Amino acid sequence: MLTGVLQDWVWEAGETANESCPVGSLRTASAVNSCHQGRIPLFTVGVESTKQVQEAVRFARKHNLRLVIRNTGHDLAGRSSAPDSFQIHTHHLQEIQFHADMRLDGSNTSLGPAVTVGAGVMMGNLYAQAARHGYMVLGGDCPTVGVVGGFLQGGGISDFLSLNQGFGVDNVLEYEVVTADGELVVANALQNQDLFWALRGGGGGTFGVVTRATMRVFPDVPVVISEILLEAPQAISSSWTQGLSIVLTALQSLNRDNVGGQLVIAVLPKLAVQASIKFFFLDATEATVIDRRMKPFLTKLSRANVKYTYSSKNLPHFSSNYRQVPDIHSDNDYGVLGSTVAISQQLFDSPQGPEKVATALANLPVSAGDLIFTSNLGGRVISNGELAETSMHPAWRSASQLINYVHTVEPSIEGRAKARERLTNTQMPMLYALDPNLKLSYRNVGDPNEKDFQQIYWGPNYGRLSNIKKKWDTDDLFFSKLGVGSERWDSEEQLCLLHA
């Protein structure tokens, strides 16, 4: 196992030198000679037990080592790696235990069915195990992402289940955490409540090493999935924009009936574009019934002379929809940058909302290989705001959709620098301008150059998070880029304390 390798090469190299050597690039002597350490940790410990996590944390503290926590290396800001660092890799913590009736220690209150998950478990494995027990789990659509890492500490947005079940952090019942002094503590609604609140949205690798977490599970219900596929030779055209507007209007309408959906736009060679929007009708069993429900939207596409393909299928279990095989990337060097912007329910549900979003997406400057996709919020995300005590920005409880933009980066230091500059100075301002009253981004997939991260990610909750950070990690043993308390340090390359 290559313990230091990240999901993509962008965050393996340093900020100022092209030091990375993706495996596929080692074809010439000159390429090999250019290899350096970059941001890959100097040392990694592959922990196999909670006790080993405690020993590793105490070792890092004793020797004043720069400590990073790695689950699967998917973080799009490179937080699971750092220059000159000592890494704790949680991959081997593979516990999965289901509870028919979860109760916290010292309480007789039933919290319903739940699952306890070790810090190394990936989504695909958990989905498969849950299905065998008749459950589905709120998670992401990438099967190789870790459940307990950044996903379940940074928010936990599910592209198509958050509408019905809320955020991942809304459904966490308990964390087991190794703190900066190497002690093992439990954080839940009954004990260490401040730490529990901070971990539910405050970001991974910041307050301690989460070794396992317990979260709610839900019945594995049947589903009908309908899909509309659009294609166009170029994005900037009236027919393309109109087609996007119509399918987003369908999303707007169906969301009101708690039907989740996801739009995915792929930029093809020569800037041709393809869009797929899928709708998930939970507890439905008859595809023909759903086809009749979708017919008015298809009629609108036909009348607008928008070419489309429609299909539908019924699955006896929603879990069957989850991909349970690893993502397959091309043999070329794989590197991406990405960011996100939230869209309020007030904007998206307005009569002009779908058209405004469609126009913004159609006019966003993109390159071949880029992806734009939505994550469905609203619904339970909003209603949970009255119930769930989480540290996420309160404005999430007014959000309807999340726009995700992923850009394929040229495999060079120049390509990386150009992509980051374009993302920060051109694309993100255009996306933020779509809903200027809600300047909100998802910390797990945020602009790596974000200057106002405290406000963008946490807003009025940041002060409390900062105080909890100081209480549980007085010496900032756990440093996370653009994380709580990181403003006290300079660039991650040097990591020198600016102020206490």
From Swiss-Prot:
Domain of life: Eukaryota
Cofactor(s) required for function per UniProt: FAD
EC main group: oxidoreductase
One Pfam family per UniProt: FAD_binding_4
Transmembrane segments: none
Domain annotation FAD-binding PCMH-type: ranges: 37-220
Coiled coil regions in record: none
Record key words, sorted: Alkaloid metabolism, FAD, Flavoprotein, Oxidoreductase
EC number: 1.-.-.-
Matching InterPro entries: BBE, FAD-bd_PCMH, FAD-bd_PCMH-like_sf, FAD-bd_PCMH_sub2, FAD-linked_Oxidoreductase, Oxid_FAD_bind_N
Gene3D superfamilies in the cross-refs: 3.30.465.10
A molecular function (GO) term: oxidoreductase activity
Gene Ontology terms describing biological process: indole alkaloid biosynthetic process
Involved pathway(s): Alkaloid biosynthesis; ergot alkaloid biosynthesis
Protein family per UniProt: Belongs to the oxygen-dependent FAD-linked oxidoreductase family.
Protein role: FAD-linked oxidoreductase; part of the gene cluster that mediates the biosynthesis of fungal ergot alkaloid. DmaW catalyzes the first step of ergot alkaloid biosynthesis by condensing dimethylallyl diphosphate (DMAP) and tryptophan to form 4-dimethylallyl-L-tryptophan. The second step is catalyzed by the methyltransferase easF that methylates 4-dimethylallyl-L-tryptophan in the presence of S-adenosyl-L-methionine, resulting in the formation of 4-dimethylallyl-L-abrine.
Name of the protein: FAD-linked oxidoreductase easE
